[in-house]
Amino acid sequence: PIPLLEGDQLRHGYLASISFADSLVGQVLEKVSALGLDDNTVVVIWSDHGYKLGDHGGWAKHSTVELDIHIPLMIRFPNMKVPGARTSALVESVDIYPTLIELASIDPPHVLEGASLLPLIEEPQRPWKEAVFAQYPRYVKRQLLMGETVRTQHYRYTAWVGNDTGETVAQELYDHTNDKIEAKNVAKNSEYRVELDRHEQLRKLGWRHIREKLDEMISQDSI
């Protein structure tokens, strides 16, 4: 464990770095405006990962918990229909590229894991992805396991899968309605059996299944 004083110093440094980065972003946006480029500039601000500051007994990233995977994402472009709007929809970093190429009127490649966020940006409360995915490895007793995690609107489910065997050796399920900090694993609680099975099925179906459902929904909305 990190001593209390050292932990406070680390948190202080982390918050200071955020403030510094925020000021730099402000300088960039001010320069864009001063150059008269607001009307043809797309701004995207996001992080590649979250960060633990002593939470879950750890520091930095390197896990599948919400703090490490849930990141900020802000997008600004000219003539937005709903500027400053927020959404609680589930989105992924792989959605950024499809969004940018649509804004640039570039035809997308045949297969993309992500989906353009423009329909969601224009209508922030609309239905969107049922689930999003991430993964991170760890060694347990010299065995390499891949943590395959699925986030839905109210739950996070993680299956720890043997890299060599493909077998699931452990499961985690967190109920975000009652446990936003993911402190209690309810995977073995019989009351959550239906949700456990549903999320395991989503994991096996994977991102292609979610993309197909989203594409179908968007197509129906455009009719």
Task: Put a short name on every predicted segment.
Residues 1-41, 195-198, 205-207, 221:
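A long, amphipathic alpha-helix that forms part
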Residues 97, 183, 203:
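Generic structural marker for isolated residues within well-ordered, non-membrane alpha-helices
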Residues 34-37, 123-126, 188:
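Secondary-structure boundary motif
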Residues 49-55, 81, 94-97, 102-176, ...:
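C-terminal cap/loop subdomain of S1 sulfatases and analogous C-terminal strand-loop tails that border
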Residues 14, 18-21, 25, 42-47, ...:
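Beta-strand elements within well-structured catalytic alpha/beta cores of enzymes
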Residues 30-85, 89-92:
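Histidine-centered active-site microenvironments of extracellular/periplasmic hydrolases
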Residues 3-17, 60, 81-91, 103-108, ...:
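Active-site rim elements
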Residues 1-2, 17, 169, 178, ...:
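Long, internal low-complexity/basic segments
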